[in-house]
């Protein structure tokens, strides 16, 4: 009996060690890609090998990388399909711009303004995620996707009629009409469909890198925590999770809110990268674009999403003459990915190739299985 207990303890220790080893590998690859890409881009920029137009895409690349990672938390780790990620991005963008303009009245230290604005954008976006998540997370599959899509469109249309500005006394005022009484044009922050104008551009490539590193840190630590394992167990078998007492709604809401907060931070940095930002920028196509990053990078694969987001943000700028066909190309690629995923023959072939090149492949997996079979025979 004692020998069997010791074997169980040692097998659990081995599983925990392997899980920790996988975490370290995934974290090392993700951080390595981000830091390596940052260094390479900086060297190429210093050498004058990157044009001005492509340099202007550095911050959007980082923003989309962060959005892909945060959406992976819902789609890959939680196993739910969300089509409203651009809505949380919009909430964070306009909230962050509003806070930056308020802080700019009395503060000139830009790093503090950026950090506070991003935290404020994350807070408002997480509140939106919490309010939206409570009633809708009882839904599953296509129904949840449709509701999140509707949420994204509601947010965009809400921004089209929202007006913020300072009055003659310096007080912040808002309205849901075409004019704000006693607010001069140069004191308006958000002007309905015209969007936010006069924003001081403070976002830089370095801030984008820090955002990506923070997003990877949060998602990987949540994924490998006790709560993350509960979320993934519910994803794999909801009924089994409920049967052992897991609060399904609580854990799904946790993933949804954290994902919304990270999207809000990314949206804030995106807003601080432009002097003018319009609500139409956060339409349905943006949500689909982020989902494309996740699917092409591999659902649940953090570093794959990083590569996909970076490449698909750079390529339209590189092949600008074909930019009109971008969404058509993404749609075709998505269809091909779905066909390859659900076709047994193609899937088996891809799985065979991936098994050979998988950096997370457990080389001792076969030995472990052999030991397990041997121990069962001894026990019998």
What is the predicted role of each segment?
Residues 2-380:
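Transmembrane alpha-helices and adjacent helix-loop boundaries
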């Amino acid at each position: 009996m004692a020998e069997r207990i010791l074997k169980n303890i040692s097998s659990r220790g081995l599983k925990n060690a392997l899980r920790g080893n996988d975490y370290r590998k995934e974290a090392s690859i993700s951080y390595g890609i981000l830091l390596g890409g940052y260094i390479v881009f900086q060297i190429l920029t210093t050498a004058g090998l990157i044009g001005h137009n492509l340099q202007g895409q550095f911050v959007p690349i980082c923003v989309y990388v962060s959005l892909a990672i945060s959406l992976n938390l819902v789609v890959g780790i939680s196993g739910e399909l969300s089509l409203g990620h651009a809505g949380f991005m919009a909430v964070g963008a306009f909230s962050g711009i509003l806070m930056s303009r308020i802080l700019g009245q009395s503060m000139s230290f830009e790093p503090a303004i950026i950090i506070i604005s991003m935290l404020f954008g994350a807070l408002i976006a997480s509140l939106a995620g919490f309010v939206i998540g409570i009633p809708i997370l009882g839904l599953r599959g296509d129904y949840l996707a449709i509701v999140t899509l509707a949420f994204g469109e509601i947010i965009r249309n809400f921004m089209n009629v929202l007006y913020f500005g300072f009055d003659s006394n310096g007080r912040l005022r808002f309205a849901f009409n075409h004019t704000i009484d006693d607010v001069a044009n140069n004191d308006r922050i958000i002007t309905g469909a015209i969007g936010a104008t006069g924003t001081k551009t403070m976002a830089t490539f370095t801030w984008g890198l820090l955002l990506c590193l923070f997003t990877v840190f949060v998602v990987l630590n949540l994924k490998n925590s006790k709560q993350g394992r509960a979320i993934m167990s519910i994803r794999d078998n909801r009924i089994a999770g409920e049967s052992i007492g897991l609060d399904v709604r609580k854990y799904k809401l946790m993933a949804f809110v954290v994902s919304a907060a990270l999207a809000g931070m990314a949206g804030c940095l995106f807003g601080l990268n432009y002097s003018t930002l319009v609500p139409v920028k956060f339409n349905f196509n943006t949500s689909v674009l982020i989902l494309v990053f996740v699917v092409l990078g591999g659902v649940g694969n953090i570093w794959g999403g990083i590569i996909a987001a970076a490449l698909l943000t750079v390529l339209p700028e590189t092949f600008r003459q074909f930019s009109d066909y971008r969404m058509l190309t993404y749609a075709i690629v998505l269809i091909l990915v779905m066909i390859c995923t659900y076709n047994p023959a193609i899937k088996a072939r891809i799985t065979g190739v991936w098994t050979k090149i998988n950096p997370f492949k457990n080389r001792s997996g076969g030995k472990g299985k052999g030991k397990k079979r041997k121990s069962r025979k001894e026990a019998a």
